[in-house]
UniProtKB/Swiss-Prot annotation:
Organism: Drosophila erecta
Keyword RNA-binding applies: yes
GO molecular function: nucleotidyltransferase activity; tRNA binding
Chain's role: Plays a central role in 2-thiolation of mcm(5)S(2)U at tRNA wobble positions of tRNA(Lys), tRNA(Glu) and tRNA(Gln). Directly binds tRNAs and probably acts by catalyzing adenylation of tRNAs, an intermediate required for 2-thiolation. It is unclear whether it acts as a sulfurtransferase that transfers sulfur from thiocarboxylated URM1 onto the uridine of tRNAs at wobble position.
GO biological process, one term: tRNA wobble position uridine thiolation
Top-tier EC class: transferase
Enzyme Commission (EC) number: 2.7.7.-
Name used for this protein in its record: Cytoplasmic tRNA 2-thiolation protein 1
Superkingdom of the source species: Eukaryota
GO cellular component terms attached to this protein's record: cytosol; cytosolic tRNA wobble base thiouridylase complex; mitochondrion
Entries under InterPro entries matching the protein: CTU1-like_ATP-bd (IPR056369), CTU1_C (IPR032442), Ncs6/Tuc1/Ctu1 (IPR000541), Rossmann-like_a/b/a_fold (IPR014729), TilS/TtcA_N (IPR011063), tRNA_thiolation_TtcA_Ctu1 (IPR035107), UPF0021_CS (IPR020554)
Pathway connected to this protein: tRNA modification; 5-methoxycarbonylmethyl-2-thiouridine-tRNA biosynthesis
UniProt-annotated location(s): Cytoplasm
Pfam families with a match to the protein in the record: ATP_bind_3, zn-ribbon_14
Length: 343
């Protein structure tokens, strides 16, 4: 038997919202989805009139829906924002090269300027080459660190006031779980924040989709017929996040509200004053924000360039010993060559 739309618009329901369980027609779902994102933006004061905002664009469902909705809300509610697309090319054959074509389609569809930065031009490496050297066990560590800094570099280059990322409610709940399981209190403090950074030397990042369910983002993109890239990264199956995602899906089967429950729990967490907060400063090598000297990106890059790919994996003291050992070996070789040349 057909079900009427719960909003009493007179139309038949076309879907059931995963977040609320409401039976809605497509138009009422669009209106509710967009209104919730507008409420998130306005209640959290994410933007100010006249600001230039970079939308972190990957071509996937989240960034595509984010670009579409931000453009729509910017016009509907007169935010007064200048929107641009910022995309990072990690150099993953068969994945990123294809998804960038979707990003270019987004550029044309939404009439937004697009800037693409590659790992190759920023670091002299592609993820394909990195994985060839390190294998698949820690590749997501390299990619995540380089990608975060690449977005900062791109944002600085574009002169934007903030970066809008497509992190959704599922992503944030997964991150809370990951940080709890790893005992990472530093990241646990800030992983539910809708705005991060924004100090004197940093460009803030905002998450307009923080309370949007992944399933609803997919439904919105589907019913709106948005063009997006849906293939998973070829290196992602071994990522630690995948285990947190699987665990979250299992929890959701027995408690449908678990995603929002975890986010709200993360927001309410308090730490003792005795728990030390990592101090964020500026990397003395690259000049970008870091909680260590040198920053993680510079340490990982040094390891790759030295042929010590595991330099930035694990404890800092271990990395320092690896550098000292290699420097000692190089010094011994140079000394041996000098002695040889003397004869």
């Amino acid at each position: 038997m057909p079900i009427n739309c719960k909003s009493q618009c007179g139309n038949r329901a076309a879907l059931k919202r995963p977040k609320t369980g409401d039976a809605l027609c497509k138009e009422c779902f669009f209106a509710a989805f967009e209104a919730e994102i507008h409420h998130t933006i306005s209640s959290s004061n994410l933007f100010r009139r006249g600001e230039k905002v970079a939308v972190a664009a990957s071509g996937g469902k989240d960034s595509t829906v984010l670009a579409h909705v931000l453009k729509l809300l910017n016009e509907r509610h007169n935010y007064g924002l200048e929107l641009v697309l910022l995309s990072i090319d990690e150099g993953i054959t068969g994945y990123r090269d294809d998804s960038l074509e979707t990003v270019k389609q987004n550029r044309d569809d939404y009439q937004m300027p697009l800037k693409i930065l590659s790992y190759e031009e920023l670091y002299g490496w592609t993820m394909d080459r990195i994985v060839a050297q390190i294998g698949r066990s820690n590749n997501c560590t390299f990619c995540g660190v380089f990608r975060r800094q690449a977005l900062d570099r791109g944002a600085k280059l574009l002169g934007v006031d903030s970066i809008a990322t497509g992190h959704n409610a599922d992503d944030i709940a997964e991150t809370v779980l990951m940080n709890v399981l790893r005992g990472d209190t530093a990241r646990l403090r800030r992983c539910t924040s809708i705005r991060t950074g924004g100090g004197e030397d940093t460009i803030p990042r905002v998450k307009p989709l923080k309370y949007s369910y992944e399933k609803e983002i997919v439904m919105y993109a589907h019913y709106k017929k948005l063009v997006y890239f849906s293939t998973e990264c070829v290196f992602a199956p071994n990522a630690y996040r995948g285990h947190a995602r699987a665990f979250l899906k299992d929890l959701e089967k027995v408690r449908p509200s678990v995603i929002m429950d975890i986010i709200y729990s993360g927001e309410q967490l308090r730490f003792k004053d005795t728990v030390k907060k990592p101090e964020r400063g500026i990397c003395t090598r690259c000049g970008f924000v870091s909680s260590q000297q040198p920053c993680k990106a510079c340490v990982l890059l040094e390891g790759l360039n030295r042929g010590l790919p595991k330099l930035g994996i694990g404890k800092k003291s271990k990395g320092e010993r690896m550098i000292a050992k290699q420097d000692q070996e190089l010094a011994l070789r140079e000394r041996a060559n000098l002695v040889k040349n003397d004869f």
